[in-house]
């Protein structure tokens, strides 16, 4: 999900594990730990767009990473607590170096099975490791410059720090797996993308009440009972809303299935997901032999049915000559084969991921789709780049989305 949500979740989890001992420091480190998996986006700085796409929500979002990174970071924070002296203490830099090497081996080694060239993996592993180690490094510098030293009774110790990082990190990919994007929980053993499709990648109803109670908790004494109560209220409200989204998912799946049967549309498979920023308006994509069928349903609709379906031609044969090319294989895997090919006005082909729907409710223009990639040949080589073009009527599109969410008669 979005960064603010993951920061909030990490802070709340950090408070549960170490709040009594560290107070707001636990929330800060929890927010940092909750952000760590998404530092895989740093790959965009050093590699091509398709490799970065494959790497996002991969090893850093895996159960393996949560299990192995936790003791590495737990050991590092434990050692940081124990260090005395200033920046000239060689033990500070030795421990940072050891932890950085261990993280690099975990990130790069765990990515060798991916469809990314080895040199690119080394570059990605390096930049992601630097991003992860930056926060302990910054903390080390600040503590050394300020001469901060905590007595042993205020130090969590290796086991507690490890437990802290495990829960703060693992909750990130588990939450991401509830969205449509897909999360590779089982890397490096499987590239399966877990996607439960029950909540949008950004949902303010989930995030803002949660954030409010975490902020309230942060203003209270670290050993006080009210602090724990408010933090747990935030966790409880967000968890209750998450259960509500699963209920909606089951309900909407049934409505789409019955609506397809009513229209006598024979399909091979279908998927449903909430539209952006809400859990009221849902979209569904169903696949038949040569076309996809797209429909929308709001929980506020007068009747429990999808009133109409739009047919979207597949045109998969247009990229058949490139079927064995790495970029096409990655895009097909990324989209779970819910894709259509569109010929743009400039003659180039565009690969559109249908799971994320349309900005305008239409599917016949290169600017309609939320997630598109331009395919072209340059100097005999296939080049794929993301399309960031948006319709001029984006504001109107959001208004139409809002009106549709309010229901139809």
Regions picked out by a protein language model, each given a short descriptive name:
Residues 1-254, 258-274:
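N-terminal membrane-targeting hydrophobic helices
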């Amino acid at each position: 999900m979005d960064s603010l949500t993951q920061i909030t979740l990490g802070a709340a989890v950090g408070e549960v594990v170490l709040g009594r001992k560290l107070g707001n420091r636990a929330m800060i480190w929890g927010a940092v730990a909750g952000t760590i998996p998404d530092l895989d986006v740093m790959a965009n700085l050093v590699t091509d767009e398709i490799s970065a796409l494959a790497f996002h929500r991969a090893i850093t979002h895996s159960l393996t990473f949560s299990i192995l990174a936790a003791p590495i970071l737990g050991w590092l924070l434990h050692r940081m607590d124990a260090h005395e002296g200033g920046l000239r203490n060689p033990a500070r830099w030795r421990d940072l170096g050891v932890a950085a090497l261990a993280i690099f081996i975990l990130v790069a080694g765990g990515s060798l099975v991916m469809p990314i060239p080895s040199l690119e993996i080394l570059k990605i592993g390096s930049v992601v490791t630097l991003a992860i180690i930056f926060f302990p490094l910054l903390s080390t510098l600040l503590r050394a410059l300020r001469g901060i030293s905590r007595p042993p009774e205020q130090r969590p110790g290796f086991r507690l720090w490890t437990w802290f990082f495990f829960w703060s990190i693992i909750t990130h990919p588990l939450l991401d797996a509830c969205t449509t994007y897909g999360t590779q929980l089982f890397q490096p053993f499987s590239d399966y993308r877990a996607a439960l499709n029950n909540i949008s990648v950004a949902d303010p109803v989930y995030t803002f009440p949660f954030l409010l109670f975490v902020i309230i908790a942060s203003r209270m004494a670290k050993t006080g009972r009210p602090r724990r109560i408010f933090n747990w209220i935030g966790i409880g409200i967000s968890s209750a809303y998450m259960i509500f989204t699963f209920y909606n998912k089951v309900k909407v799946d049934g409505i789409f299935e019955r609506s397809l049967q009513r229209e006598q549309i024979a399909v091979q498979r279908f998927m449903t997901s909430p539209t952006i920023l809400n859990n009221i308006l849902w979209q569904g994509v169903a696949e038949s032999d040569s076309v996809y069928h797209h429909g929308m349903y709001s929980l506020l609709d007068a009747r429990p049915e999808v009133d109409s379906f739009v047919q979207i031609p597949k045109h998969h044969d247009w990229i058949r000559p490139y079927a064995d090319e790495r970029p096409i294989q990655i895009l097909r895997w990324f989209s779970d084969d819910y894709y259509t090919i569109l010929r743009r006005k400039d003659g180039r082909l565009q690969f559109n991921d249908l799971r994320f729907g349309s900005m305008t409710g239409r599917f016949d223009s290169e600017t309609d789709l939320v997630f598109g990639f331009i395919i072209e040949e340059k100097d005999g080589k296939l080049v794929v780049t993301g399309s960031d073009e948006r319709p001029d009527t984006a504001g109107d599109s959001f208004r139409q989305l809002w009106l549709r969410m309010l229901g139809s008669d």
